[in-house]
């Protein structure tokens, strides 16, 4: 029999398959299946650690290549070279052969050695350049330091030990002006010159002063331009210093302190002629180093620029290759037959495509032994695979955030496509705000391709749900027209059905009443009559309307959700769920809240002014229905025979409680006892035979779908475990279900009043914002009024977008999401499934965080 056509209404039919693949083409088969993205592989080596698996060495080799590619990327970022990103819509990567992967690994190794060598050379030369630059600054500043030092011999003398003072005086007395340059050596005074970071100068000076007890004379000057620190590759401000002291031990101590503080000490001659020669030598060496450095940098940048053209493609290729070997590690290896054996789940309708793909790989490899795929009969619960497209994907995602639907149950996302945005629109309901939202959604859809590349997380989240925003905006336009509300103002699209009756003695401040223009004729054709806006009883009327509408929408939402539980029970052939849960639950719910909705609609349809009667309150009616059955509030009837009808409905609702409570558990116990009496095992017991048991395994060379099957079952919906029927557990579960259902019928209905509350809040906030900005601006006159109008409109627009569209929109969306997750899904969805996660390259590229920076 041909398989059923897959529909979005429920998950696709799944089959467990067993693949027998020749070891020579295992990698190629995995590549082909990764491109298809239709097989969810099971781990057949769960007892082995990651290091014991067959292809661990290949993965480690690819990890090393990936590390090398990341190293290239870091060097490109350091050099400021842009990366050419991989565009999946334009660029096509053909599956590489093992030879091409080996060549890529060798090339990456060679390039890493070359780039590392160039990088080391560059860093060494850069460090040498900095040292020569610092030395030049020291030589340049040293002349001034020495001149000042010779002019302050008294200060230098005071900075030395008192025991040496007579010697210094004697030397000074015998020195002439011509001998001044050799006076330091003659006075046994030495010096240390160098460069230190500006942020360390103060600490450096304090340490020297305390360590040497003031026996030093220090000069320093700032280097005006920042110098690049090669260790951190950032500009650093530094100072030149020259410290004068006497004694070899003190000078050695100064050098040690300087080096410990991160200072660089340089050799400087105190004679100006020799210093001049040093400057010339340093300049020549610096120029040579800069030339070599420039050439090295150009070579390195050229190498990295060439790598940047292919790096993204290489990274994706290696990532795919790693995924292939990780998947191969899930396979079992039959050493006797040199065959890889794999098990997995795939959509039943896609089995022919998978078979043809395996055949194509076999034909390309030229193997005589075919790859075989056998469908296995199993009692394991298949994964849930819900096919989506660009439009439904976001809706499916918000449902999956709550849970994964049970295999083959009604897909909760299908009704959500309509109900979620519509309930949002009921709460949002402003025509003007909806138009702005609609324009934003259409813009995101129109410029879809360029906006897809935006990496800003918050925008990416909104962009992912662009079709949700679109549908929410369309429904909000509709509800805005129904409410006749645009930025808290009304639209006079049609003639009003009301007219004001103005008394002859009318004065400002008096209340004016309105009457129907044609009592038995014209009615406002669509939405809310604009005459209601601005009246004294506007809120009274609108609140009553929106409150009752919220109850009706909640009733409709929960009723269709209950109907889905009937569809699920029929599909899974569980009639007891229909008669034990659905029927009594539906009768209970409709006896109370279905009746309330009918009363609301009936009350709306009666011309109470024409009858001359006061309409009864429905809230009190419902309270009296439970507290005083057969009694009406104030004795006012909504319709003839109301008291009798309410008593009958209440009895009908009460009768359903024991049916809900006892029918299903006792029926299951009776069914179990009957089965045991006939000699069968208890309901829920199952037997399982491993798919890889050699005794039960058929010859894999046989191409029949079921000849290789080795999985047997006694329960179509089992999970492969032995479960005895326990009446106590079933009874407790049913008691909980009954209590929850009865209480939730009340609480969930009340929960829909949030539709009215948020709609009211949105309308009132919009009115306040208008009155605080545009209303005042429109009243102003003259040039100042025009300027104020521009400013007020800017404020009005910005605050409308931020507060009323974004903040209020998010609030309404979350409330609508709660109504879907809790009030609707609790009526029919089990969410007992597990997701279908196939081996797919496309999915890997979309979800990998590491590859995002390589894909554009």
Swiss-Prot record:
Residues 429-430, 491-544, 604-648, 764-784 are vacuolar. The chain crosses the membrane at residues 410-428, 431-447, 461-490, 545-564, 583-603, 649-668, 739-763, 785-823. The keyword Ion transport applies. Pfam families: V_ATPase_I. Keywords: Hydrogen ion transport, Ion transport, Membrane, Transmembrane, Transmembrane helix, Transport, Vacuole. GO terms for molecular function: ATPase binding; proton-transporting ATPase activity, rotational mechanism. Residues 692-707 have a biased composition (Acidic residues). InterPro entries: V-ATPase_116kDa_su, V-type_ATPase_116kDa_su_euka. Belongs to the V-ATPase 116 kDa subunit family. PANTHER family: V-TYPE PROTON ATPASE SUBUNIT A (PTHR11629:SF63), VACUOLAR PROTON ATPASES (PTHR11629). This is V-type proton ATPase subunit a. It comes from Neurospora crassa (strain ATCC 24698 / 74-OR23-1A / CBS 708.71 / DSM 1257 / FGSC 987).
